[in-house]
Protein backbone atom coordinates (compact mmCIF):
# COMPACT_ATOMS: atom_id res chain seq x y z
CA UNK A 1 0.00 0.00 0.00
CA UNK A 2 1.37 3.42 -0.95
CA UNK A 3 2.29 5.79 1.86
CA UNK A 4 0.26 8.95 2.40
CA UNK A 5 3.03 11.54 2.47
CA UNK A 6 2.87 15.30 2.97
CA UNK A 7 6.02 17.25 2.13
CA UNK A 8 6.78 20.88 2.91
CA UNK A 9 9.67 22.90 1.49
CA UNK A 10 10.54 26.11 3.33
CA UNK A 11 12.68 28.39 1.16
CA UNK A 12 14.27 30.92 3.48
CA UNK A 13 17.06 33.44 3.21
CA UNK A 14 19.36 31.58 5.62
CA UNK A 15 18.35 27.95 5.12
CA UNK A 16 16.26 25.60 2.99
CA UNK A 17 14.31 23.02 4.99
CA UNK A 18 12.32 20.04 3.74
CA UNK A 19 9.94 18.19 6.08
CA UNK A 20 8.47 14.80 5.17
CA UNK A 21 5.44 13.69 7.17
CA UNK A 22 3.34 10.54 6.89
CA UNK A 23 -0.36 10.31 7.67
CA UNK A 24 -1.00 7.05 9.52
CA UNK A 25 -4.12 4.89 9.53
CA UNK A 26 -5.55 6.93 12.42
CA UNK A 27 -5.21 10.08 10.30
CA UNK A 28 -2.43 11.35 12.56
CA UNK A 29 0.67 13.12 11.29
CA UNK A 30 4.14 11.71 11.94
CA UNK A 31 7.42 13.36 10.93
CA UNK A 32 9.63 10.82 9.14
CA UNK A 33 12.40 13.04 7.79
CA UNK A 34 13.81 16.56 7.88
CA UNK A 35 16.54 17.79 5.55
CA UNK A 36 18.25 21.17 5.63
CA UNK A 37 20.80 22.98 3.51
CA UNK A 38 22.39 26.42 3.46
CA UNK A 39 20.28 28.79 1.39
CA UNK A 40 21.91 30.26 -1.68
CA UNK A 41 20.35 32.40 -4.39
CA UNK A 42 17.68 33.79 -2.05
CA UNK A 43 17.62 37.37 -0.78
CA UNK A 44 14.96 38.80 1.53
CA UNK A 45 12.79 35.75 0.87
CA UNK A 46 12.93 36.07 -2.94
CA UNK A 47 14.86 34.00 -5.49
CA UNK A 48 17.54 36.09 -7.17
CA UNK A 49 19.63 33.26 -8.63
CA UNK A 50 17.76 30.18 -9.82
CA UNK A 51 20.88 28.06 -10.42
CA UNK A 52 22.22 28.66 -6.91
CA UNK A 53 18.80 28.14 -5.32
CA UNK A 54 18.31 24.96 -7.36
CA UNK A 55 21.36 23.36 -5.74
CA UNK A 56 20.26 24.35 -2.23
CA UNK A 57 16.71 23.07 -2.79
CA UNK A 58 17.95 19.79 -4.29
CA UNK A 59 20.34 19.22 -1.39
CA UNK A 60 17.61 19.81 1.19
CA UNK A 61 15.10 17.49 -0.51
CA UNK A 62 17.69 14.76 -1.08
CA UNK A 63 18.67 14.88 2.60
CA UNK A 64 15.00 14.52 3.62
CA UNK A 65 14.56 11.60 1.19
CA UNK A 66 17.60 9.85 2.63
CA UNK A 67 16.44 10.22 6.23
CA UNK A 68 12.81 9.28 5.53
CA UNK A 69 13.49 6.50 3.03
CA UNK A 70 10.86 8.06 0.75
CA UNK A 71 10.88 9.11 -2.87
CA UNK A 72 9.44 12.62 -2.98
CA UNK A 73 7.47 13.54 -6.10
CA UNK A 74 5.53 16.63 -5.03
CA UNK A 75 5.49 19.15 -2.21
CA UNK A 76 4.12 22.43 -0.89
CA UNK A 77 6.52 25.35 -0.90
CA UNK A 78 6.63 28.48 1.25
CA UNK A 79 6.78 31.98 -0.19
CA UNK A 80 7.68 35.25 1.50
CA UNK A 81 9.20 38.56 0.45
CA UNK A 82 8.22 42.21 0.57
CA UNK A 83 5.74 41.78 -2.30
CA UNK A 84 3.30 39.92 -0.03
CA UNK A 85 0.24 41.97 0.93
CA UNK A 86 -3.07 41.33 2.61
CA UNK A 87 -6.37 43.09 1.97
CA UNK A 88 -9.89 42.68 3.35
CA UNK A 89 -12.84 42.33 0.98
CA UNK A 90 -16.59 41.76 1.09
CA UNK A 91 -18.93 39.87 -1.21
CA UNK A 92 -22.74 39.78 -1.36
CA UNK A 93 -25.12 37.20 -2.88
CA UNK A 94 -28.85 36.58 -2.83
CA UNK A 95 -30.14 33.25 -1.51
CA UNK A 96 -32.04 31.80 -4.45
CA UNK A 97 -33.49 28.59 -3.02
CA UNK A 98 -37.23 28.46 -2.34
CA UNK A 99 -36.62 27.55 1.29
CA UNK A 100 -34.17 30.48 1.79
CA UNK A 101 -31.88 28.00 3.54
CA UNK A 102 -28.16 28.77 3.15
CA UNK A 103 -26.07 25.87 1.89
CA UNK A 104 -22.41 25.21 1.06
CA UNK A 105 -22.87 26.42 -2.52
CA UNK A 106 -24.11 29.78 -1.24
CA UNK A 107 -21.03 30.09 0.98
CA UNK A 108 -18.77 29.26 -1.96
CA UNK A 109 -20.59 31.84 -4.14
CA UNK A 110 -20.19 34.63 -1.62
CA UNK A 111 -16.49 33.84 -1.17
CA UNK A 112 -16.05 33.93 -4.96
CA UNK A 113 -17.84 37.30 -5.01
CA UNK A 114 -15.50 38.62 -2.31
CA UNK A 115 -12.51 37.38 -4.32
CA UNK A 116 -13.52 39.46 -7.33
CA UNK A 117 -11.16 42.35 -6.62
CA UNK A 118 -8.94 44.16 -9.09
CA UNK A 119 -5.29 43.23 -8.61
CA UNK A 120 -2.35 44.36 -10.76
CA UNK A 121 -1.25 42.09 -13.61
CA UNK A 122 2.02 41.32 -11.85
CA UNK A 123 0.32 39.95 -8.72
CA UNK A 124 -1.61 36.77 -7.92
CA UNK A 125 -3.88 35.56 -5.14
CA UNK A 126 -2.20 33.13 -2.74
CA UNK A 127 -4.95 32.69 -0.13
CA UNK A 128 -8.56 33.69 0.48
CA UNK A 129 -9.45 33.24 4.16
CA UNK A 130 -13.02 33.79 5.42
CA UNK A 131 -13.40 36.13 8.40
CA UNK A 132 -17.13 36.30 9.06
CA UNK A 133 -20.55 36.17 7.41
CA UNK A 134 -23.54 38.49 7.65
CA UNK A 135 -27.05 37.09 7.12
CA UNK A 136 -29.74 39.71 6.47
CA UNK A 137 -27.69 42.31 8.33
CA UNK A 138 -26.83 40.08 11.32
CA UNK A 139 -23.00 40.11 11.68
CA UNK A 140 -20.34 37.95 13.39
CA UNK A 141 -21.59 34.65 11.98
CA UNK A 142 -18.84 32.06 11.53
CA UNK A 143 -20.87 29.28 9.95
CA UNK A 144 -24.02 30.34 8.08
CA UNK A 145 -24.90 26.89 6.72
CA UNK A 146 -28.54 25.89 7.41
CA UNK A 147 -29.46 29.42 8.53
CA UNK A 148 -32.43 31.13 6.85
CA UNK A 149 -32.03 34.37 4.95
CA UNK A 150 -32.37 36.20 1.66
CA UNK A 151 -29.03 38.03 1.64
CA UNK A 152 -25.62 36.58 2.50
CA UNK A 153 -22.50 38.71 2.87
CA UNK A 154 -19.02 37.36 3.39
CA UNK A 155 -15.90 39.14 4.59
CA UNK A 156 -12.56 37.62 3.63
CA UNK A 157 -8.85 38.31 3.92
CA UNK A 158 -7.07 38.06 0.56
CA UNK A 159 -3.31 37.51 0.51
CA UNK A 160 -1.51 38.34 -2.73
CA UNK A 161 2.09 38.19 -3.87
CA UNK A 162 4.32 38.81 -6.84
CA UNK A 163 3.45 36.52 -9.77
CA UNK A 164 7.05 36.42 -10.96
CA UNK A 165 8.34 35.50 -7.48
CA UNK A 166 5.83 32.67 -7.24
CA UNK A 167 6.50 31.46 -10.78
CA UNK A 168 10.27 31.52 -10.30
CA UNK A 169 9.90 29.53 -7.10
CA UNK A 170 7.74 26.90 -8.81
CA UNK A 171 10.05 26.78 -11.81
CA UNK A 172 13.08 26.24 -9.60
CA UNK A 173 11.41 23.34 -7.75
CA UNK A 174 10.21 21.85 -11.05
CA UNK A 175 13.74 22.00 -12.45
CA UNK A 176 14.91 20.09 -9.38
CA UNK A 177 12.51 17.33 -10.50
CA UNK A 178 9.54 17.88 -8.21
CA UNK A 179 5.94 19.04 -8.67
CA UNK A 180 4.52 21.86 -6.56
CA UNK A 181 1.14 21.15 -4.94
CA UNK A 182 0.67 24.67 -3.60
CA UNK A 183 2.55 27.88 -2.85
CA UNK A 184 1.81 28.83 0.77
CA UNK A 185 2.63 32.07 2.57
CA UNK A 186 5.48 31.17 4.92
CA UNK A 187 4.18 33.18 7.88
CA UNK A 188 0.73 31.61 7.51
CA UNK A 189 2.36 28.16 7.69
CA UNK A 190 4.40 29.24 10.74
CA UNK A 191 1.25 30.39 12.51
CA UNK A 192 -0.28 26.92 12.03
CA UNK A 193 2.70 25.44 13.88
CA UNK A 194 2.85 27.88 16.80
CA UNK A 195 -0.49 29.52 17.62
CA UNK A 196 -3.28 28.02 19.68
CA UNK A 197 -6.91 28.33 18.62
CA UNK A 198 -7.57 30.39 21.76
CA UNK A 199 -4.89 32.92 20.82
CA UNK A 200 -6.30 33.32 17.32
CA UNK A 201 -9.79 33.79 18.72
CA UNK A 202 -8.73 36.36 21.32
CA UNK A 203 -6.70 38.36 18.80
CA UNK A 204 -2.97 37.83 18.46
CA UNK A 205 -0.13 39.56 16.65
CA UNK A 206 2.02 36.88 15.05
CA UNK A 207 5.57 37.81 14.03
CA UNK A 208 7.87 35.58 11.97
CA UNK A 209 11.32 37.19 12.02
CA UNK A 210 13.76 35.66 9.56
CA UNK A 211 17.14 36.58 8.17
CA UNK A 212 15.87 38.80 5.36
CA UNK A 213 12.33 39.85 6.28
CA UNK A 214 9.96 40.16 9.22
CA UNK A 215 6.46 38.90 8.43
CA UNK A 216 3.34 39.84 10.37
CA UNK A 217 -0.17 38.41 10.65
CA UNK A 218 -2.77 39.92 12.98
CA UNK A 219 -5.51 37.43 13.88
CA UNK A 220 -8.86 38.69 15.16
CA UNK A 221 -11.75 36.36 16.06
CA UNK A 222 -9.81 33.42 14.61
CA UNK A 223 -8.98 34.87 11.18
CA UNK A 224 -6.27 37.12 9.69
CA UNK A 225 -7.24 40.78 9.36
CA UNK A 226 -3.83 42.17 8.55
CA UNK A 227 -0.86 40.64 6.73
CA UNK A 228 2.33 42.57 6.13
CA UNK A 229 6.05 42.28 5.53
CA UNK A 230 8.84 44.51 6.78
CA UNK A 231 11.84 44.10 4.45
CA UNK A 232 14.30 43.97 7.35
CA UNK A 233 15.37 40.82 9.18
CA UNK A 234 18.01 39.73 11.66
CA UNK A 235 20.73 39.93 9.02
CA UNK A 236 20.45 43.71 9.39
CA UNK A 237 21.59 43.26 13.00
CA UNK A 238 24.66 41.39 11.76
CA UNK A 239 25.48 44.23 9.38
CA UNK A 240 25.07 46.77 12.20
CA UNK A 241 27.56 44.89 14.39
CA UNK A 242 29.98 44.61 11.48
CA UNK A 243 29.72 48.34 10.78
CA UNK A 244 29.96 49.61 14.37
CA UNK A 245 32.74 47.26 15.46
CA UNK A 246 34.46 47.23 12.06
CA UNK A 247 34.63 43.46 11.68
CA UNK A 248 33.84 41.13 8.73
CA UNK A 249 30.25 39.98 8.37
CA UNK A 250 31.02 36.35 9.31
CA UNK A 251 32.70 37.50 12.54
CA UNK A 252 29.74 39.77 13.31
CA UNK A 253 27.33 36.87 12.71
CA UNK A 254 29.24 34.65 15.14
CA UNK A 255 29.27 37.41 17.77
CA UNK A 256 25.52 37.90 17.32
CA UNK A 257 24.81 34.18 17.75
CA UNK A 258 27.13 33.53 20.69
CA UNK A 259 26.83 36.74 22.70
CA UNK A 260 23.91 38.73 21.33
CA UNK A 261 21.00 39.75 23.55
CA UNK A 262 17.99 41.90 22.70
CA UNK A 263 17.63 43.76 25.99
CA UNK A 264 20.39 45.12 28.25
CA UNK A 265 18.26 44.48 31.36
CA UNK A 266 18.94 40.72 31.25
CA UNK A 267 22.71 41.12 31.56
CA UNK A 268 23.93 39.45 34.74
CA UNK A 269 26.74 41.98 35.01
CA UNK A 270 27.36 45.33 33.35
CA UNK A 271 31.02 44.29 33.14
CA UNK A 272 30.48 41.32 30.80
CA UNK A 273 32.72 41.39 27.74
CA UNK A 274 32.92 39.98 24.21
CA UNK A 275 36.21 38.97 22.61
CA UNK A 276 36.71 39.92 18.96
CA UNK A 277 39.30 37.54 17.45
CA UNK A 278 42.46 38.79 15.82
CA UNK A 279 41.94 40.02 12.27
CA UNK A 280 45.08 40.03 10.16
CA UNK A 281 47.63 42.10 12.04
CA UNK A 282 44.99 43.46 14.41
CA UNK A 283 45.20 41.76 17.83
CA UNK A 284 42.11 40.40 19.64
CA UNK A 285 39.89 43.07 21.16
CA UNK A 286 37.69 43.10 24.24
CA UNK A 287 34.33 44.82 23.84
CA UNK A 288 31.47 45.50 26.23
CA UNK A 289 28.57 43.06 25.94
CA UNK A 290 26.29 45.88 27.04
CA UNK A 291 27.42 47.89 24.01
CA UNK A 292 26.60 44.86 21.83
CA UNK A 293 23.14 44.65 23.37
CA UNK A 294 22.54 48.34 22.61
CA UNK A 295 23.45 47.80 18.93
CA UNK A 296 21.06 44.84 18.69
CA UNK A 297 18.31 46.47 20.74
CA UNK A 298 18.33 49.61 18.58
CA UNK A 299 17.73 47.74 15.32
CA UNK A 300 15.14 45.33 16.72
CA UNK A 301 13.29 48.20 18.41
CA UNK A 302 13.14 50.00 15.06
CA UNK A 303 11.56 46.93 13.42
CA UNK A 304 8.95 46.56 16.16
CA UNK A 305 8.16 50.29 16.14
CA UNK A 306 7.54 50.06 12.36
CA UNK A 307 5.12 47.19 12.99
CA UNK A 308 3.34 49.09 15.73
CA UNK A 309 2.93 52.12 13.46
CA UNK A 310 1.34 49.96 10.73
CA UNK A 311 -1.14 48.39 13.14
CA UNK A 312 -2.02 51.75 14.71
CA UNK A 313 -2.57 53.22 11.24
CA UNK A 314 -5.16 50.52 10.55
CA UNK A 315 -6.96 51.03 13.86
CA UNK A 316 -6.27 47.47 15.01
CA UNK A 317 -3.93 48.08 17.94
CA UNK A 318 -6.59 47.47 20.60
CA UNK A 319 -7.44 44.06 19.09
CA UNK A 320 -4.29 42.27 20.33
CA UNK A 321 -6.01 40.78 23.40
CA UNK A 322 -4.14 37.47 23.11
CA UNK A 323 -0.75 39.16 23.09
CA UNK A 324 2.17 38.76 20.71
CA UNK A 325 3.88 35.57 19.51
CA UNK A 326 7.32 35.70 17.90
CA UNK A 327 8.89 32.86 15.93
CA UNK A 328 11.63 32.42 13.34
CA UNK A 329 15.37 32.93 13.79
CA UNK A 330 14.85 36.32 15.43
CA UNK A 331 13.08 34.63 18.33
CA UNK A 332 16.42 33.17 19.46
CA UNK A 333 17.70 36.47 20.90
CA UNK A 334 17.63 36.26 24.71
CA UNK A 335 15.50 39.09 26.07
CA UNK A 336 13.55 39.71 22.87
CA UNK A 337 10.21 39.10 24.63
CA UNK A 338 11.13 41.86 27.10
CA UNK A 339 11.75 44.25 24.21
CA UNK A 340 8.47 43.39 22.47
CA UNK A 341 6.51 43.92 25.69
CA UNK A 342 8.24 47.26 26.18
CA UNK A 343 7.37 48.47 22.68
CA UNK A 344 3.80 47.15 22.44
CA UNK A 345 2.71 47.05 26.09
CA UNK A 346 1.21 43.59 25.47
CA UNK A 347 2.41 40.22 26.82
CA UNK A 348 4.73 38.36 24.45
CA UNK A 349 5.97 34.80 24.13
CA UNK A 350 8.31 32.83 21.87
CA UNK A 351 6.42 30.61 19.42
CA UNK A 352 7.85 27.08 19.33
CA UNK A 353 6.47 24.53 16.84
CA UNK A 354 3.88 22.30 18.46
CA UNK A 355 4.91 18.74 19.22
CA UNK A 356 4.24 16.30 16.38
CA UNK A 357 4.83 12.55 16.45
CA UNK A 358 8.35 11.76 15.26
CA UNK A 359 9.80 15.23 15.75
CA UNK A 360 13.15 15.43 17.55
CA UNK A 361 13.94 17.92 20.31
CA UNK A 362 16.43 19.68 18.05
CA UNK A 363 13.61 20.63 15.68
CA UNK A 364 11.27 22.08 18.33
CA UNK A 365 12.88 25.40 17.54
CA UNK A 366 11.52 28.70 16.14
CA UNK A 367 13.78 28.28 13.09
CA UNK A 368 11.68 25.29 11.96
CA UNK A 369 8.20 26.80 12.50
CA UNK A 370 7.53 27.53 8.83
CA UNK A 371 8.71 24.15 7.51
CA UNK A 372 6.72 22.19 10.09
CA UNK A 373 3.75 24.50 9.64
CA UNK A 374 3.61 23.63 5.94
CA UNK A 375 2.87 19.95 6.64
CA UNK A 376 0.38 20.84 9.39
CA UNK A 377 -1.39 23.26 7.04
CA UNK A 378 -1.61 20.67 4.25
CA UNK A 379 -2.79 17.97 6.66
CA UNK A 380 -5.67 20.14 7.87
CA UNK A 381 -6.51 20.97 4.25
CA UNK A 382 -6.42 17.28 3.35
CA UNK A 383 -8.81 16.39 6.19
CA UNK A 384 -11.19 19.18 5.25
CA UNK A 385 -11.27 18.17 1.57
CA UNK A 386 -11.94 14.56 2.54
CA UNK A 387 -14.90 15.61 4.68
CA UNK A 388 -16.24 17.87 1.93
CA UNK A 389 -16.37 14.85 -0.40
CA UNK A 390 -18.28 12.88 2.22
CA UNK A 391 -20.55 15.88 2.72
CA UNK A 392 -21.47 15.96 -0.98
CA UNK A 393 -22.61 12.33 -0.82
CA UNK A 394 -24.52 12.88 2.42
CA UNK A 395 -26.39 15.89 1.02
CA UNK A 396 -27.85 13.81 -1.78
CA UNK A 397 -29.68 11.78 0.84
CA UNK A 398 -29.90 14.15 3.73
CA UNK A 399 -28.74 17.46 5.12
CA UNK A 400 -25.09 17.88 5.97
CA UNK A 401 -24.41 15.96 9.20
CA UNK A 402 -23.78 17.78 12.46
CA UNK A 403 -20.30 16.26 12.58
CA UNK A 404 -19.43 17.78 9.23
CA UNK A 405 -20.93 21.13 10.17
CA UNK A 406 -18.81 21.15 13.31
CA UNK A 407 -15.70 20.39 11.27
CA UNK A 408 -16.61 23.12 8.81
CA UNK A 409 -16.91 25.62 11.64
CA UNK A 410 -13.73 24.52 13.41
CA UNK A 411 -11.31 24.10 10.54
CA UNK A 412 -12.36 26.46 7.77
CA UNK A 413 -13.10 29.36 10.04
From Swiss-Prot:
SUPFAM superfamilies given in the database record: Actin-like ATPase domain
Key word Disulfide bond present: no
CDD domains: ASKHA_NBD_FtsA
UniProt KW keywords: Cell cycle, Cell division, Cell inner membrane, Cell membrane, Membrane
One record GO biological process: FtsZ-dependent cytokinesis
Any single Gene Ontology cellular-component annotation: cytoplasmic side of plasma membrane
InterPro entries referenced in this protein's UniProt entry, alphabetically: ATPase_NBD (IPR043129), Cell_div_FtsA (IPR020823), FtsA/MreB (IPR050696), SHS2_FtsA (IPR003494)
Subcellular location(s) per record: Cell inner membrane
Membrane topology, record value: Peripheral membrane protein
Keyword flag Nucleotide-binding: no
Transmembrane segments: none
Domain of life: Bacteria
Job of this protein: Cell division protein that is involved in the assembly of the Z ring. May serve as a membrane anchor for the Z ring.
PANTHER family in alphabetical order: CELL DIVISION PROTEIN FTSA (PTHR32432:SF4), CELL DIVISION PROTEIN FTSA-RELATED (PTHR32432)
NCBIfam families: ftsA
Family classification: Belongs to the FtsA/MreB family.
Quaternary organization: Self-interacts. Interacts with FtsZ.
Protein name per its UniProtKB record: Cell division protein FtsA
